[in-house]
């Protein structure tokens, strides 16, 4: 009788131990990369001559969700692409680079569609605030270096169309 109890206890302990040795199953979550969605085109014109400086395909951020997430979690952006933010009011707008993996130039644009100020070479993942120097209604995010490459200046004009 003692041996039967011994074997019963042994079997119970063996099952408990084997169950406890089960290897943890780690879930692998596959995330899809966020891709660019062309929603319009934007052209920047030189202030004095009205000559075309550069044209971009733009993704438009207009809703609260779109303006809050912007280019977060994106791995890259083509040189002819940008994120164009449209705000309902002319205000001092501030951005930061939280969860943004691409260095950016921020072009702040007033309600008359003129470049009002810049923040150049904003660094990925930096949560320092990047504010416009004057009240603006639009902001264009481009790959870092675009402002210098195309000699964009305060007063240059933009025009955009939605697709």
Predicted regions located by residue number:
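C-terminal motif of bacterial Sec signal peptides marking the signal peptidase cleavage site
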Residues: 17-20
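Compact, glycine-rich, soluble single-domain proteins
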Residues: 22-163
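Bacterial N-terminal signal peptides that target proteins for export
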Residues: 1-8
């Amino acid at each position: 009788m003692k041996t039967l109890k011994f074997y019963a206890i042994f079997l119970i302990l063996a099952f408990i131990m084997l169950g406890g040795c089960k290897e943890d199953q780690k879930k692998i979550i596959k995330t899809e990369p966020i891709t660019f969605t062309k929603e319009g085109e934007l052209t920047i014109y030189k202030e004095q001559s009205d000559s075309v400086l550069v044209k971009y395909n733009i993704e438009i951020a207009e809703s609260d969700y779109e303006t809050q997430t912007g280019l977060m979690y994106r791995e890259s952006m083509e040189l002819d692409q940008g994120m164009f933010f449209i705000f309902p009011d002319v205000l001092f707008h501030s951005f930061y680079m939280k969860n943004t993996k691409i260095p950016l130039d921020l072009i702040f644009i007033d309600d008359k569609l003129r470049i009002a100020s810049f923040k150049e070479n904003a660094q990925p993942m930096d949560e320092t605030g990047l504010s416009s120097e004057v009240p603006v209604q639009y902001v264009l995010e481009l790959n870092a270096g675009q402002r210098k490459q195309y000699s964009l200046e305060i007063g240059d004009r933009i025009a955009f169309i939605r697709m």
